[in-house]
Regions:
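Generic hydrophobic, helix-prone segments enriched in Leu/Val/Ile
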Residues: 108, 114-116, 122-123, 134, ...
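Long, leucine/valine-rich, helix-dominated scaffolding and oligomerization segments
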Residues: 2-226
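Detector for Asparagine
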Residues: 3, 26, 62, 73, ...
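Short strand-loop-strand
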Residues: 329, 338-491, 497-523, 527-600
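A broad "ordered helical/assembly scaffold" signature
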Residues: 75-105, 326, 330-335, 498-502, ...
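Extended, domain-scale alpha-helical bundle/helix-rich regions
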Residues: 195-395
Length: 600
């Protein structure tokens, strides 16, 4: 098995000399196709061993590189079939990967490393060949163009494209593991694109020579790699990461990458660095607009316009499901982070204080209701069967009066009483005590249990030089709803409800940009009052009071997929009921929807 350290060491050394094919290996194309067809009949481990052996022998075989690429394509198809089976063991996991799943991840990444190692030799040899041809005297320019130079250029373009494709798949695996890609991966990616620009292969349509499924040119593939990084997918649920990766082809067609910026964009890539796409700030190491830096600039406005148009079309068609929520989240995230970044309050050390956040709609509702279940809050015993809640908000723990510790996180806030901005920053404190955020009788907070948002569940030693760690998916994700509970001594709680707009994943204290939705909260139950065929069972809801400083109106936050604009709903607390109308939708994510409401 090849791990990252072996892979990096191989790329850092000179390409090994080509060796004669072993007698046991047949380089005939038809023979290899027959081998690939029979490969799935074997056990998975045997398939992996055979693929590793064939890839190694093809890499060092003394054959023409055009023939090598043809044979590589056959092996690549066989490897992709096996990889698809291996990935089924972990891509739908909702929690941290266990050791069993990490073993499959390691096997998949090993195959990708081996493929890159094979293509790397082709790239180096073709670059040397093109340089030699360039230095030779020009005797017959047309003949040279249609023979050596042209075929070498196509071979180089195909090898570069396939290498970038393998790097894309590696980055996809890192994202599913919630692991930060190593700097060397992005250095290699940037260098490949830079080389393709220099060799003028970046816009060659390789679909005329090999099957392509995700892009036709090196430039299009690089655009997908950049977009995947800009979307900060590690701050999403794993299911959404998979959906983003499937939609990259469509989305990247609206991404514009140029050497000369077309607008005042601040998103760029330094092609001579190991950095992923970066947003220009005062802390950047370089000024990308200086001519002596080799940078490309990324324009996102056209992509956001496409996402918004697609989202609006789904609304018209009444298809406001998973794709709609993802489109909405991505469009809002790109606008917030890169196009029209909102000014968050400067971090004031004098105003720093520790607080706690509760995530998960049901846990938030349970806390705001003073730890009452939904049935208790709305006196469900007095309701007919067709209005009874179908589920409870109380945590499923040994003790019913405990809030789920897995949704409680300790944070640092940087606010003061006169803060007017609705966009703020907090720091997540890892490996911290997660106390009961409800005040005890003496007004003090009481600790409950330890919690770490980034905990190592399992470690698999796939090689003595490489260790894979299992990372818990973040509970505070982009567009996550949360309740911020500040320390308080009075009877009334000091809290705010907000939504995550951006999360930095790699700091010691992960930084979270969030939007305040309100401070005055009431927990209640809501049911549909319309006379149609939809369910009329009560569901949990939160009334958010309007705020003059935040310039917000009274609104209702409910779990997504229950209601729509124009609905007449019944709000209930104890036995008291009020009729409301949902006037306008203010926000919708896969977790919650927020509506402006009026009382009827």
């Amino acid at each position: 098995m090849v791990n990252l350290s072996i892979f990096q060491q191989y790329l850092a050394t000179d390409t090994p000399l080509l060796q004669p094919l072993p007698k046991s290996f047949n380089s005939d194309e038809q023979h290899l196709r027959k081998w690939a067809a029979l490969l799935p009949l074997q056990a998975k481990m045997q398939q992996i061993e055979q693929l590793e052996k064939v890839l190694t022998e093809l890499r060092t075989a003394n054959i023409d590189d055009r023939q090598r690429l043809t044979l590589f394509n056959i092996v690549l198809d066989a490897a992709n079939q096996l990889i698809a089976l291996l990935r089924q063991h972990y891509i739908y996991e909702t929690q941290a990967f266990n050791a069993y799943q990490l073993d499959y991840v390691a096997q998949v990444k090993s195959l990708y490393y081996l493929m890159i190692m094979g293509y790397d030799g082709v790239i180096k040899r073709e670059i040397i060949l093109l340089a030699d041809n360039e230095s030779q005297p020009t005797t017959n320019l047309w003949q040279r163009y249609f023979t050596n130079d042209r075929s070498s250029t196509i071979t180089l373009a195909i090898a570069t494209y396939q290498t970038l494709l393998m790097y894309q798949k590696l980055l996809f695996e890192e994202a599913l593991c919630y692991q930060k890609p190593t700097a060397s991966l992005w250095f290699n990616i940037n260098q490949l694109y830079y080389m393709a620009c220099q060799q003028r292969t970046v816009n060659i349509d390789v679909s005329a020579y090999i099957p392509t499924h995700c892009a036709d040119t090196i430039h299009q593939l690089y655009a997908q790699l950049c977009l995947h990084s800009l979307l900060n997918v590690r701050a999403m649920r794993r299911a959404n990461i998979l959906m983003v990766q499937r939609l990259l082809l469509e989305w990247s067609e609206h991404l514009i990458i140029t050497v000369e910026p077309q607008t005042e964009t601040k998103v760029f890539v330094n092609l001579n660095s190991d950095s992923a796409p970066t947003y220009l700030t005062a802390h950047c190491a370089i000024n990308p607009y200086d001519a002596h830096h080799d940078c490309v600039f990324i324009e996102l406005a056209a992509l956001v316009a496409h996402l918004t148009s697609r989202r609006d079309k789904l609304i018209e068609e009444g298809r406001e499901g998973a794709e709609y929520c993802l489109l909405n989240t991505v469009a809002m995230t790109l606008s917030y982070r890169y196009i029209q970044p909102r000014l968050t309050l400067p971090i004031k050390q004098s105003a720093k204080q520790e607080a706690y956040v509760i995530t998960g709609f049901n846990d938030i509702h349970y806390r705001v209701s003073d730890e009452q279940s939904l049935s208790s809050l709305i006196a469900a015993k007095d309701l007919p069967d067709h209005q009874q809640p179908r589920y409870e908000t109380s945590p499923k723990k040994q003790s019913a009066n405990l809030t789920s510790t897995h949704t409680m996180l300790k944070v640092e806030t940087f606010e003061s009483n006169n803060d007017l901005s609705d966009f703020r920053t907090l720091h997540l404190l890892l490996h911290s005590e997660a106390p009961d955020v409800g005040a005890s009788s003496d007004g003090k907070n009481t600790p409950k249990a330890s919690y770490s948002d980034k905990k190592v569940e399992d470690i698999i030693d796939t090689d003595k030089n490489h260790v894979l760690t299992s990372i818990e998916p973040p509970s505070l994700r982009i567009m996550s709803l949360f309740l911020l509970c500040r320390p308080h001594q009075s009877a009334s709680p000091d809290w705010s409800i907000g939504v995550v707009r951006w999360r930095e994943m790699d700091n010691e204290k992960p930084e979270i940009d969030w939007q305040v939705l309100g401070h005055q909260l009431i927990a209640c139950g809501i049911r549909l009052h319309n006379r149609d065929n939809r369910s009329r069972h009560f569901v949990p809801a939160l009334v958010v009071g309007g705020d003059e400083q935040l310039q917000t109106v009274c609104s209702l936050i409910v779990p997504t997929s229950h209601f729509q604009v124009g609905d007449k709903v019944m709000m209930r607390i104890d036995s008291k009921q009020k009729t409301l109308r949902l006037v306008r939708r203010l926000m919708m994510t896969e977790e919650f929807s927020q509506y402006e409401v009026v009382q009827l």
